Regions:
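Short, amphipathic alpha-helical "lid/cap" segments that border enzyme active or binding sites
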Residues: 51-58, 62, 116, 188-192
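Hydrophobic alpha-helical
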Residues: 1-24, 90, 108-171
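Secondary-structure boundary/capping motif
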Residues: 15, 81-82, 114, 190-191
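Structured loop/turn residues at beta-strand edges in well-structured enzyme cores
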Residues: 26, 40, 66, 100, ...
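Flexible loop/hinge segments that line or gate small-molecule binding clefts
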Residues: 5, 13-52, 63, 70, ...
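Structured C-terminal subdomain patch of bacterial secreted/periplasmic proteins
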Residues: 168-193
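Structural recognition of the beta-strand scaffold that forms the well-ordered cores
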Residues: 5-9, 29-34, 47, 71-74, ...
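An alpha-beta-alpha
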Residues: 55-100, 104-105
């Protein structure tokens, strides 16, 4: 009601599916940014490759570990395809580095509602990775805080989003809370075009 165009960047592509269909039925164009939604009823999709993002993260991990070490992969919500595509890209690179081992993998969601309990469970098994890959920068900072509170050895934490805002990914790399962040293209500039 009262809009000419809807631009949406879904975190949960299944959750908003019915709303998108309803808006399209009213004749309002819908531009979807970042990942496909379950419905094919949208006007335009501006997609960015989470697969390539996963490959970039994998290349960074292999380089940082000099081809030998351990990682823990924490995945976002797998209801959409973004987390799975990132995972696939990461693993395609890791196949080329047999001495880089994934010693734990956990689905924490994009916001990590149970992150601390999940990390407690993982670390209580005695695993200690060299690198933890977080699904986003916010979760990465929480992981860093968790490891510091528990006086664990230094673990490199990699985030995704790379926002250049106060307390964003770039700031947290500068502050040492993240070892690295990878820029996730939001697509807002393309949507405006």
């Amino acid at each position: 009601k009262g809009i000419d165009l809807l631009v949406v960047s879904p975190c949960d592509s299944v959750l908003i599916d019915s709303q998108i269909q309803s808006i399209i039925k009213r004749g309002i164009p819908v531009v979807v940014l970042g990942q496909e939604v379950a419905t094919k009823h949208y006007t335009t999709l501006i997609d960015f490759s989470n697969y390539e993002l996963g490959r970039d993260i994998g290349s960074y991990v292999v380089h940082t570990l000099n081809g030998k070490g351990t990682i823990m992969e924490l995945m976002g919500d797998v209801k959409g395809n973004a987390a799975q595509q990132r995972h696939d890209g990461l693993y395609d690179v890791l196949k080329t580095a047999p001495n880089v081992k994934v010693i734990a993998q956990c689905r924490v969601g994009w916001e990590g509602p149970h992150l601390e309990a999940q990390l407690d469970s993982l670390f209580n098994t005695g695993i200690m990775p060299d690198i933890i890959i977080a699904p986003n920068d916010r979760t990465g900072v929480r992981i860093n805080d968790f490891t510091k509170k528990r006086h664990l050895k230094h673990i490199d934490v990699i985030g995704v989003d790379g926002l250049n805002v106060p307390d964003g990914g770039l700031h947290n790399v500068e502050q040492g809370k993240l070892s690295a962040t990878f820029v996730y293209q939001t697509g807002g500039d393309k949507a405006i075009q």
